[in-house]
Amino acid sequence: VTAAGNGRAKVHDITQHSLEAVRKIKEAFNEIWHHELIAESRARIAAFARDAVQRVKDGTPPLSPVLLYEELVALFKDRVWRRSMALFLMGAMCGGCAGVALGLRLGARAAAGPHARALHTHHDQTVVLVEDAVTPAAGAGEVLIRVQAFSACCADRAALRGRGSALRALLGRPAVTVGRGFAGVVLDVGLGADALELGDEVWGCAAEWAPGAAAELLTVRSTLVSKRPRALAADAAASLPWAGAAALAALQRLQYDPENCKGKRVAVCGAGSGEGCVLVQLLSLWGASVAVLAPRHAALTLQDLGATEFVDVEGGHVSSWEPLEQHASRRGPWDAVLACSGAGTPPTPVENTAALLKSTAPRNAVVDLRPSPLLSDRLPAPLSLLFAASFYSFRVLRWMVGCGWHTDWLWSHASRAPGLETLARLVDEGHLRPVLDKVYLPQEFETALAHACSDEAIGTTVVRFP
């Protein structure tokens, strides 16, 4: 009996609460409905409807352009109506943008996949190895890759310091930000990723605004990876994609190719870096005379890669471009100058280009490959909101015209599948070989990053999952 009484009491309470909620909703609706502005709007609509009906009866078209124009002019002369419409439009715009942003965030969440080890970053730039990180499942056009090794370079330090953070926030990326180039094996293929199959050995790049490759399981779009050369092990393969893509992008900016590069004089500063080693090999392969600016302990390696001139950097630290300018005054200026992130590159941009370049060199003959803050990272708060709205609007426009919802257009052509296939072909033909420096374990990532950014590094530093 007590239980039955308690049940009836609970039902009665629920009924009373429901009736009270309905009553409050009715009161709120009546208050809004009888508000002065709403009542005035209803009166205007009713008057316009009566006038339209009367005009139909009289045989006059109710939707005459002249009549509509007169009505709009009369409305816009009403200050209260203008203020009400402005508030309505602002509320609709803010609410619509918030709804679209929330929908995009919720729609970007992929289904949870398996757990694996990954390096997660924190706001204080520390990197922690997580043993059970959740990996998103492979969606349409994506592949799930078991990462065997990934590279550590100066771009990782730039990402830890905030490079690409605005784009990462807009894309809803997870916390993993380190690991740029990677090599692994395909474990799962999503719908539409027909170019790859299970078990394919692949390599690829992860930009600073992407999740990063420092995870044992990685989900990426199939257009951002390609099959790696079979002759390369995972360690050597992971050292080449990011550095090779950066080198190809720099040569594309200079519009250099095997047909027009022969006989040109090119200076590569910081040639001991991963991208510097690739540039030296490609330029020497295409017939250019390559001068390198690097520490003395890297001289033999760079000469073996094809360098013809060596500018010694004592101690690896250079505060200005004076050593290179002095060498140019003795041996002659260059057709192009490439500044890499390795030891020997001055921290400041080139100012006296006339002392380094030939008079016939184009204006863009100085290419800086070092990571610098993106424009989206430097915008103040009002402009960052405008950038976010423009970014989402552009994505929606691309989706409406049938270009898809992906963000492949953010990547350079050299870091996507066509550029990676070009690197693989050069390796298979024996024209390009990776320069592997040291190999570390995931728990030693901070040591690996410190070595990769030091003056002692020659080539690319790699971290391998055991």
Can you annotate each of these PLM segments?
Residues 7-19, 25, 30-38, 42, ...:
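C-terminal hydrophobic helical "lid"/dimerization subdomain
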Residues 29, 76-81, 138-151, 165-209:
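Glycine-rich beta-strand-centered segment in the early N-terminal region that forms part
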Residues 244-316:
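Mid-domain Rossmann-like dinucleotide-binding core that forms the NAD(H)/NADP(H) cofactor-binding site
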Residues 347-429:
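Glycine-rich phosphate-binding loop and adjacent beta-alpha segment
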Residues 157-167:
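Short Gly/aromatic-enriched secondary-structure transition segments
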Residues 46, 53, 57-66, 73-74, ...:
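NAD(P)H dinucleotide-binding glycine-rich loop of Rossmann-like/cofactor-binding domains
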Residues 284-354:
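Adenosine-nucleotide cofactor-binding segment
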Residues 97-111:
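Short hydrophobic alpha-helical membrane-entry/anchor segments
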